[in-house]
């Protein structure tokens, strides 16, 4: 059974074709600059170098057609025709309170996802456009929606409600939803396998650290709290996002900097985080290079980020009354040994200690704890596409 996984953004579309018989990626690619000049599709097979084709992609329908064309191409393709695709799994950022699990897509589901646009105006519209484009081109192939938010639907109300007038929650659905759920769930399950223990007997803190970052407290396989909130802006300082700040700063800035709602949203989402602090970059590789060259603000940005992660780990140890494993995942979590070391340092009183040599390993599943550590510290590469494909198979079989 071959599953096509689609992750549609506003001007890009990432995809993977996975053979679920042995869970191997047959091909993966990217359609970029959709609706913009100089658009292209890039595809690679296995370990082969990617092939890049300049192609006019006026909209997402053009992009999906380009994907099918590339997958079935005599030279760069991996299947003979579209009929070899058994199902399509779509990543959808926000399911609101309407979805607490992945679902087979039908018109009712589409309408419910559209109703979530209010709470996810940046992310859900391109996700919807991607589904509609697939439905036009592959009308007879079953499609599944996998939501970033559903793993966090197990959070208790005292964890997800904000202390605003309760009527605002009832009227607008203002509450913590959490994101990166597919990743948090996947790495928690992998941690359970690595530790050879049932998820039901484990307390795990998963740290998804990339350009967007979030922490999750996973107790007995369920998310009981997470750092992102109503939007992905809450929580840690990230690549370009401020993370949690005093809400009065918003009104102060609007007045002092003469900003409107869009202006202050752009400031908090696109110009803040480690980019805003450092003035250098949102990329940690650039920050480390600048810090090594003596840039104190780049060094400060890294310290602020690591301090934030450390605080969430402490918070979640408290709410779970302990922890068995801490997991690092995503681009920074998997590959940045300096950041991992800064986060874990000075937590040995909790039994959290890492081996410096093991910590140098990058991008592979590894236990980096010392032999005598009471808490296991694991590095686990995330695989959201495989997780989406597995959910798709589960629902369409």
UniProtKB/Swiss-Prot annotation:
Task: Indicate the quaternary assembly.
Answer: Homodimer.
Q: Where is Mg(2+) bound in this sequence?
A: 7, 384
Q: What PANTHER family does the entry give? A: ACETATE KINASE, ACETATE KINASE-RELATED
User: Which organism encodes this protein?
Assistant: Ruminiclostridium cellulolyticum (strain ATCC 35319 / DSM 5812 / JCM 6584 / H10)
Q: In which pathway does it act?
A: Metabolic intermediate biosynthesis; acetyl-CoA biosynthesis; acetyl-CoA from acetate: step 1/2
Q: How is the cofactor bound?
A: Mg(2+). Can also accept Mn(2+).
- Enumerate the residues binding substrate: 91
One GO molecular-function annotation for this sequence? ATP binding
User: Biological process GO terms, please?
Assistant: acetate metabolic process; acetyl-CoA biosynthetic process
Q: Which domain of life is it from?
A: Bacteria
Q: SUPFAM superfamilies from the xrefs?
A: Actin-like ATPase domain
Q: Which gene encodes it?
A: ackA
- Xref: InterPro entries: Ac/propionate_kinase, Aliphatic_acid_kin_short-chain, Aliphatic_acid_kinase_CS, ATPase_NBD
Q: Which family does it belong to?
A: Belongs to the acetokinase family.
Q: Which reaction does it catalyse?
A: acetate + ATP = acetyl phosphate + ADP
Q: Which residues bind ATP?
A: 14, 208-212, 283-285, 331-335
> Which sites are catalytic?
148
Cofactor or coenzyme needed? Mg(2+); Mn(2+)
Subcellular location as annotated: Cytoplasm
From the Swiss-Prot or TrEMBL record, give the protein name: Acetate kinase
- Give Gene Ontology CC terms: cytoplasm
Please tell me whether the keyword Glycoprotein is annotated for this protein.
no
């Amino acid at each position: 059974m071959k599953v096509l996984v689609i992750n549609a953004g506003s001007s890009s579309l990432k995809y993977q074709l996975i053979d679920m018989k042995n869970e191997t990626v047959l091909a993966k690619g990217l359609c970029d600059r959709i609706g913009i000049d100089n658009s292209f599709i890039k595809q690679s097979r296995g370990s082969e170098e990617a092939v890049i084709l300049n192609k006019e992609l006026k909209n997402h329908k053009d992009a999906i057609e380009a994907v099918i064309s590339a997958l079935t191409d005599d030279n760069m393709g991996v299947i003979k025709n579209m009929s070899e695709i058994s199902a399509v799994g779509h990543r959808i950022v926000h399911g609101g309170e309407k979805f607490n699990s992945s679902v087979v897509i039908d018109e009712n589901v589409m309408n419910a996802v559209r109703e979530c646009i209010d709470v996810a105006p940046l992310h859900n519209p391109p996700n919807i456009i991607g589904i509609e484009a697939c439905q036009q081109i592959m009308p007879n192939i079953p499609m599944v929606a996998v939501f970033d938010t559903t793993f966090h639907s197990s959070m208790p109300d005292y964890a997800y409600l904000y202390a605003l007038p309760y009527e605002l929650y009832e009227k607008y659905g203002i509450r913590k939803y959490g994101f990166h759920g597919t990743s948090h769930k996947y790495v928690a399950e992998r941690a359970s396998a690595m530790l050879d223990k049932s998820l039901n007997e484990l307390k795990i803190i998963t740290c998804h650290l990339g350009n967007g970052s979030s922490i999750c407290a996973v107790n007995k396989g369920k998310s009981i709290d997470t750092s992102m909130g109503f939007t992905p802006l809450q929580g840690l300082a990230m690549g370009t996002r401020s993370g949690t700040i005093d809400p009065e700063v918003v009104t102060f800035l609007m007045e002092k900097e003469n900003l409107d709602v869009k202006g202050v949203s752009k400031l908090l989402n696109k110009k803040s985080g480690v980019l805003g602090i450092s003035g250098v970059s949102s990329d940690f590789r650039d920050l480390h290079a600048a810090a090594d060259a003596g840039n104190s603000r780049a060094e400060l940005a890294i310290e602020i980020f690591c301090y934030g992660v450390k605080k969430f780990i402490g918070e979640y140890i408290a709410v779970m009354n302990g922890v068995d494993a801490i997991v690092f995942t995503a681009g920074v979590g998997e590959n940045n040994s300096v950041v991992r070391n800064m986060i874990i340092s000075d937590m040995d009183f909790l039994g959290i200690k890492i081996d410096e040599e093991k910590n140098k390993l990058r991008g592979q599943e590894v236990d980096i704890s010392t032999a005598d550590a009471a808490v296991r510290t694991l590095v686990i590469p995330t695989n959201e596409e495989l997780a989406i494909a597995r959910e798709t198979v589960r629902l369409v079989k």
